[in-house]
Amino acid sequence: MIESKIPSQFSINSHNNVCEASSYSDHSFDDNTQSIPLSQVVIRSDFANETSERQSKIIIERFNQGIKNPAFTDSPALGRAFPRLDSSYFALSNRDKVAELFDPRGQRFSTVYSADPTTIIEYNGGIPKTSRYFTLYGKTVLNVPSGHFAKALSKNRPVIYGEGPHVIIDPTFIFDEATGFVNQQEPFINHSTINVLRVPSGKVAKVWVGTQPLILESRREPYVFVDAQFKVVEQIGSQDKYFHNSSATFMEHGSIKRIIPHTGEVAVTYNNGVLEIIQTPKDGKPVIIDSPTHNFECFIQTSLQTCLFPSNETKQQAIKDNKNATSDEVNLKIFQTRDSLRVGVVLVIAFRIIDPQIALTKLGKEGIINHIENISFADMGKAIQLSTLQEIMYFNDTKPSATIDASAQTIQDRVKSHLARDLYEYGIELARLQIETIKVLDTEIAKKLAGQSVTSAEFTTKQATLVKEYDIKTTEARLKAETDNIALEQKGIAIIAEAQAKLESAKKQAEALLVTANAQKKVQEIQGELYSKFPILAEIELAKIKSEALKSSTLYITPQDAGNFMNSPFFFMERMLGKQQTNIKS
């Protein structure tokens, strides 16, 4: 049979981009440490959104481009037809190792007959149209599932294909169907020199691009690097092996330092040995330092701090110096009063660092607490040596004064004023100094003081009781007076309310009488108008009045007056009334 062409119904316009295999490494970039858009490394399908029928036509068109004499025919000779294929299948064959694709659409088909004995046409069977991958003699169809990438090699270079169908005409194309498909949501996709990293929210990633360290913050779009020396620093033994918590206050990666000073603290760094203080950033972003000679030292608290002296370090040193030291000698700082008595004290000091630059420059990180402890004990020892035990015990019961009058200042006030001046020179503000504990080390004197304390406590308790009783009686009297005032106020309010109610009632009655009078006046005016218009009504009304007047009277008629009575209008009143009513009706 003579070779026939593919019917025109299967022919579409040629597409220029037939060979889709390409490698990002063909492009050059000046700075390989910068992330590039994902679209620059992922080859997208330009007909992924077409209908299935249209996709089939495009696949056949591109797969068979350049073939002048098709190897298939839809008009097979008798006995040469292949078994029918379902409409969801392609037919695959090759002519002299040149692959060809055909869509039989469920109809009869076969390969063409060639009279040339050197031409070999082979039928390679049916291929499902939904097949993810099939290839023959350098021609490949790749269907990347939704939400996936396909990793392949072309010309020994890595390529990544996006979701949808692809037709690749490339004899060097290599793809492993078992491992080539990868989910797009994978946190890290590595394909030879192509690296795609997705940093989730709340995380950061440490990576190396050659010898250049990078700390990648979280963002919606993935980071894409094309570099054979790209490497992600993994965490051993962690579920998130690729990522670190972004809330970490300090993170170091190579020469990069990522610092987040919190409110109430500052970061201490040394740039080429020069102290630099980093404050809490106001923009809410971490501070990034990218210098191999700019080192992070520590965080220093600038908010209020409270320390108890002697400190633990001082106590340990006391034990080390004297293993036979008593608990008082270890836990208390011992001084001698003006009257040669030994007392032990514990100090509470509250302070804040207002100028970390000066404090660290003059004292260093470890020397701040030691300096405060030493000079506070020095000033307190000087004040105790100038005071008697009685003065110390008296002033210990009094809180530090708020005044600066020297005559009224306590020992604590004097020590605080001197200590505050000393610390201010070192960038430290003293907020409070208090003698937390004071103990007389002489046993006999301590007992006497304890007895005095008991007596004083009893007196204080009795005094407090009397004051309390006075307060109770005063409160009761005040409550009674307030109750009486409230009762009087309520009574006055009730009287006023009653008077107002009566006034309102009288007003309502007066208004009612006025309305009634107005109504009667209106009726009389209407009657007057009627009587003026119809005089007979006035006569009738007058007759009614006379009739009513005569109802209760008795009329005596004598025989001699009978004639006059018959001529009286009263005799004819009823007849007149009847006649008048008849005239009105007519």
From Swiss-Prot:
Protein name per its UniProtKB record: Vacuolin-C
A GO CC annotation given for this chain: membrane
Disulfide bridge map: none
Segments traversing the membrane: none
Pfam families, per database record: Band_7
SUPFAM superfamilies, per database record: Band 7/SPFH domain
GO biological process entries: establishment of protein localization to plasma membrane; phagocytosis, recognition; phagosome maturation; regulation of DNA-templated transcription; response to bacterium
Keywords: Coiled coil
Family in the record: Belongs to the vacuolin family.
Top-level taxonomy: Eukaryota, Amoebozoa, Evosea, Eumycetozoa, Dictyostelia
Coiled coil: 472-526
Keyword Coiled coil tagged: yes
InterPro entries xrefs: Band_7, Band_7/SPFH_dom_sf
